[in-house]
Amino acid sequence: MLGYGREGKAMVKALETFAPRAKITIADKNESIEKHPMYPMQIGSGWLDNLQNFDVIIASPGIPPQELPMDAAIQEKITNSTQVFLDTIADRGAVSIGVTGSKGKSTTASLIAAIVKNAGKDVLLLGNIGEPAIAHLDDIKKDTHIVLEMSSYQLMHTKTSPTIAIITSFFPEHLDYHGSLESYQAAKANIARFQPKGTAIFYNKLFPEAKVIAKMSQGKKVAFTWEDAPLRIEETHLLGMHNLSNMAAASKVSLFLKVPKPVILNALREFKGLPHRLQSLGVHHGIEWVDDAISTTPESTIAALEALGDRVFTIILGGQDRGNDFSELAKKIHASKVEHVILFPGSGSRIRDALEQTENRIKLYEAASMDEAVNLAKDLTTKTKICLLSTASPSYNMFKNFEEKGEEFLKCIQR
């Protein structure tokens, strides 16, 4: 077991139950990792030693591919918990519904799960959105519908595709992890690459890369766009035109599963949205605060600005620099009613450069912490207007994940 974090621990527990005779070794480069009382461990600088001696190597999704040995014999042995999970549930006859995409996968997966549940079916929402899927093998019966949010990390070493696959969108992302756009696309493609006949893939045809990936499937291919959404945004609790695409995907998949249309529409109307995704935190200090901590690319922050319109007065941007192009975001900000931009370290300096290459109407500020950013926003934002947290960058240089970033945002607002 390579990597002994949350997913690695869940995988080891699953092996104890479903492969009790397996001889397990745990490997992790973190020398301070929690020790297992039963199994040998390879930690620190020697964590990748003697991999050729193992029959199966299960890699945790957080391990960048370039850290693993490139030896062909070793690469052939590498798999992941996603592969093990999909193979196991296929043997039980359960329906797997995998959702991937640079953006929109969490909301789309949650919408599908809500609709299927509304139809009275047994459903589990697992994967990148919550608990490791492998931890729920005991919960799966023949008639269970498993909705999996699948990141490129989780698809990386997978050689089994879900029964139903969905590609919501495609933007350059996680390039520091994958090493290149080609590797990122190849990982995403595993959601379709191993689909046999009798399966189906749904893809957003506005993204050429999604269509290329869909062609790899031997299953039924179904295209969708935002125009296929069965409701207007105003008829739901969702914000932003991009959610039309998410509703379109969810409704098309649900119809394929023979869910009646009235059931689909009812579930879409009742769906309340997800935390940290254009989530209004209410009015504090006379200002409306919107948490869009999930947005870690320029494209998703542009979508957030489009969703909220002219009420955004202050925006908090920046974080870990993944080399993204911020020129289109700069144009969008200059074309909006945004007056103040607060920049975090890292990509903040390149966002500043992009903004300063055009007109200099907008006032720029720097903040070294969330507390400093929120205090600035309290002073700068006009009453009744919006302060938006949508950083257009990941924030691993400051926070554990986007959830922690959003939670810290709320804490600072409430002080």
Model-predicted regions and their roles:
Residues M1-M11, T25-I33, L274, A293-I362, ...:
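Active-site beta-alpha connecting loops in nucleotide-dependent enzymes
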Residues K23-D28, L124-L125, V147, A223, ...:
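Short beta-strand "acidic-cap" motif of Rossmann-like dinucleotide-binding folds
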Residues E31-H36, D49-N50, I63-P69, F207-V212, ...:
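Short, charged/polar "capping" segments at the starts of alpha-helices
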